[in-house]
């Protein structure tokens, strides 16, 4: 895993390179496809822990305040080399007007190929934020094709639970999203599975888009003239010349 850069310069980030402490290195190779994922949600729901767990398999309980870092990792899924870039984002509050004016959040959502919305089962306010974030992401991607996944984190803290898992599943179904309940601290496999399925979906979309562009770029060949028609027209022209010569 590599920390690429702070989110404040995300719009300047080139797809095939990264910047780490002033040095440049490749974030993808010529044979790697770039997949960009934005992870969003309320404060303290475990967004950074989720990202680091997926990219490194390690769980770190304490983090500094989220500055909105962009991470990269090379993986292979179904035989395809992927350069996965994951944009961690600072926590947001329940206020649609604040979402619209949150430039950091907007940059991340516009940049992303897919969105992961994280909430904590121990925080009902973070659950209430899901619909706002989902609507905002759809507005920034009016084509409605961007995949959005909802992740319920801290599944191990049952004694602090404020949100029932079935409520998260019901909301995800209503919004047309995939739902995962995970414990970032205790289960890496669930975290990996959520991102793996998402990456497969993005890759499939990219393949479909490439095929459509290739299909649309094919210029249809003009129809070949009918040889019988050409012979008929040639005979007509020849007969006309013969009649003209005879009359003279």
UniProtKB/Swiss-Prot annotation:
Entry keyword Hydrolase: yes
EC numbers: 3.6.5.2
Binding site for GTP: 41-48, 88-99, 153-156
Lineage: superkingdom: Eukaryota
MF terms in GO: G protein activity; GTP binding
Record keywords: GTP-binding, Hydrolase, Nucleotide-binding
Region (Disordered): 206-228
Family from the record: Belongs to the small GTPase superfamily. Ras family.
Protein name: Ras-like protein family member 11B
Species name: Xenopus laevis (African clawed frog)
């Amino acid at each position: 895993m590599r920390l690429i850069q702070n989110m404040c310069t995300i719009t300047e980030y080139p797809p095939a390179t990264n910047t780490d402490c002033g040095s440049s290195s490749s974030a993808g190779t010529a044979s790697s496809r770039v997949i960009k994922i934005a992870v969003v949600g309320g404060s303290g729901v475990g967004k950074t822990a989720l990202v680091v767990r997926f990219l490194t398999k390690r769980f770190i309980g304490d983090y500094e305040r989220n500055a909105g870092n962009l991470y990269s990792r090379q993986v292979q899924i179904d035989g395809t080399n992927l350069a996965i870039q994951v944009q961690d984002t600072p926590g947001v509050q329940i206020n649609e007007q604040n979402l619209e004016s949150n430039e950091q959040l907007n940059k991340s959502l516009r940049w992303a190929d897919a969105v992961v919305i994280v909430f904590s089962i121990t925080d009902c306010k973070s659950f209430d934020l899901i619909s706002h974030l989902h609507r905002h992401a759809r507005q920034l991607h009016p084509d409605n094709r961007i995949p959005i996944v909802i992740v319920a984190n801290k599944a191990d803290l049952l004694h602090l639970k404020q949100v029932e898992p079935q409520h998260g599943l019901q909301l995800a179904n209503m919004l047309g999203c995939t739902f995962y309940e995970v414990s970032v601290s205790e289960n890496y496999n669930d975290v990996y599975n959520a991102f793996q399925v998402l990456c497969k979906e993005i890759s499939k979309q990219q393949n479909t888009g490439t095929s459509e562009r290739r299909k649309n770029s094919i210029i249809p060949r003009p129809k070949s003239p009918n040889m019988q028609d050409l012979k008929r027209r040639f005979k007509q022209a020849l007969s006309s010349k013969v009649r003209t010569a005879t009359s003279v």
